[in-house]
Structure formats: structure tokens, C-alpha cells
């Protein structure tokens, strides 16, 4: 049986281990057909997470925030207040069973969301995530992507910088990329609320992934 995608928004920061446990439980339920697919919008307390490709040398300041190893793809990233995390739990068996297409769709979702704020988000070959051209040869990352797939059910997802403390990224080499920086919507001179961003994410999701 196919259910419509459920949307969940957490108003308070969610501890990382709690979020992982909740995703694990939901993935099993989606696979069993007892729960609908889920998009979970939340923020975390300040932390660093290490993906399966993380290089320990990229953890510059290991004592700054808690560090969690996780099974998602990618390297080190930062999560914290002011960053909208969207955990996306979808059943790819009924969505084409193509992980590469799924990641491209996450990128497209972010690009369309940023366009709602008149920001041109761009892909970069060989670099997962969404980037903003700052001019003069400078480009900064505004959104990260890290996914895991179990029995064709996705979890983890995306992290869009709305108004985080960008200095918190200094404790790592984000995604192992030393030559580029990070930015946020507020750093670009925009002032959307988290509710504004959530509305944009919810409006553009069906454009990319289809209506329920």
C-alpha cells in the first residue's frame, strides 16, 4: 500500500543519537509497509558528524563539539542551530530504484528552494552539495547532502545553511574540501525565517519528487 509522504517539523533542537534512532525505526517500518515515507525538518545542537569517507585529519578541533560517526555517505559536516536539516526517508523501490538519480533529485530540490529566495544554487562536478558563486573566483557551499540507503529505503538527507554560526565550521574541513568556504542565506544578505525556508522546501518537493 502506498501512503502520502508525511511531513514532520521539530520545533526544538533534536539530539543526534535520538534522530538516528528514530530514522532507523522509521526505515524498518517503511520497508515493512506499516508507515508512510517521511520528510523530517529539524535542527540539531552543535555537533560534527563523520560520514563513511571521513578523513581523521579533517577533524581540526575534535574537542570543540561532540563528534558522531554515522553510516551516511560523505565526510565531515557540521550541524547546529540556524541550519535546516531535512531527513528524507523514501522508498526507492517505488521511485525508480536509482540512488544516483535520487541524489540528483536532492540537489534539484535544494536548487529550486534557493531560487525561491533569488539565490542561484549550483552543482559542481565531483563535489556533492550545492554551491554559490561569490564572484572573483570564490564559491562557497550553502547546502550539504549525505545519504544512506537500506533495502532501498533512504535516510539522512540534506542540510541547508539558513543562519548558522559559520565560525562553527572552522573545527572541520567541511566535506574534505579545503579550497572553498561555506555560506548561508543570511550571509548572502537575506533574512528568511526558518518557517520561510520550510515553506519553500515543502512547495518545491513535489515539483521534483512528485505529488502525493
Curated annotation (Swiss-Prot):
Substrate binds at residues 72-79, 144-146, 157-159. Gene3D superfamilies: Bira Bifunctional Protein, Domain 2. It catalyses: octanoyl-[ACP] + L-lysyl-[protein] = N(6)-octanoyl-L-lysyl-[protein] + holo-[ACP] + H(+). The record marks 141 as: Lowers pKa of active site Cys. GO terms for biological process: protein modification process. One of its GO terms (cellular component) is cytoplasm. Pathway: Protein modification; protein lipoylation via endogenous pathway; protein N(6)-(lipoyl)lysine from octanoyl-[acyl-carrier-protein]: step 1/2. The active site is at residue 175. InterPro entries: aa-tRNA-synth_II/BPL/LPL, BPL_LPL_catalytic, Octanoyltransferase, Octanoyltransferase_CS. Pfam families: LplA-B_cat. Its EC number is 2.3.1.181. It is found in: Cytoplasm. Its main location: cytoplasm. Keywords: Acyltransferase, Cytoplasm, Transferase. It is an enzyme of class 2 (transferase). Residues 33-212 form the BPL/LPL catalytic domain. One of its GO terms (molecular function) is lipoyl(octanoyl) transferase activity. Catalyzes the transfer of endogenously produced octanoic acid from octanoyl-acyl-carrier-protein onto the lipoyl domains of lipoate-dependent enzymes. Lipoyl-ACP can also act as a substrate although octanoyl-ACP is likely to be the physiological substrate. Belongs to the LipB family. In the reaction, the free carboxyl group of octanoic acid is attached via an amide linkage to the epsilon-amino group of a specific lysine residue of lipoyl domains of lipoate-dependent enzymes. This is Octanoyltransferase. The lineage of its organism: Bacteria, Pseudomonadati, Pseudomonadota, Alphaproteobacteria, Rhodospirillales.
Amino acid at each position: 500500500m502506498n501512503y502520502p509522504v508525511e511531513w514532520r517539523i521539530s520545533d526544538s533542537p533534536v539530539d543526534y543519537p535520538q534522530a538516528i534512532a528514530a530514522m532507523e525505526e522509521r526505515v524498518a517500518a517503511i520497508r515493512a509497509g506499516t508507515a508512510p515515507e517521511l520528510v523530517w525538518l529539524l535542527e540539531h545542537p552543535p555537533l560534527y558528524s563523520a560520514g563513511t569517507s571521513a578523513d581523521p585529519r579533517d577533524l581540526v578541533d575534535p574537542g570543540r563539539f561532540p563528534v558522531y560517526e554515522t553510516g551516511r555517505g560523505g565526510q565531515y559536516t557540521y550541524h547546529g542551530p540556524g541550519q535546516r536539516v531535512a531527513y528524507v526517508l523514501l522508498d526507492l523501490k517505488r521511485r525508480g530504484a536509482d540512488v544516483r538519480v535520487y541524489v540528483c533529485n536532492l540537489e534539484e530540490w535544494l536548487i529550486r528552494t534557493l531560487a525561491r529566495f533569488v539565490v542561484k544554487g549550483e552543482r559542481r562536478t565531483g563535489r556533492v552539495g550545492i554551491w554559490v558563486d561569490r564572484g572573483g573566483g570564490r564559491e562557497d557551499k550553502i547546502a550539504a547532502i549525505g545519504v544512506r540507503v537500506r533495502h532501498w529505503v533512504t535516510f539522512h538527507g540534506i542540510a541547508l545553511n539558513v543562519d548558522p554560526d559559520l565560525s562553527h565550521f572552522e573545527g572541520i574541513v567541511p566535506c574534505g574540501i579545503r579550497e572553498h568556504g561555506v555560506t548561508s542565506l543570511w550571509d548572502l544578505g537575506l533574512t528568511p525565517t526558518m518557517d520561510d525556508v520550510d515553506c519553500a522546501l515543502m512547495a518545491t518537493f513535489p515539483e521534483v519528487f512528485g505529488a502525493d
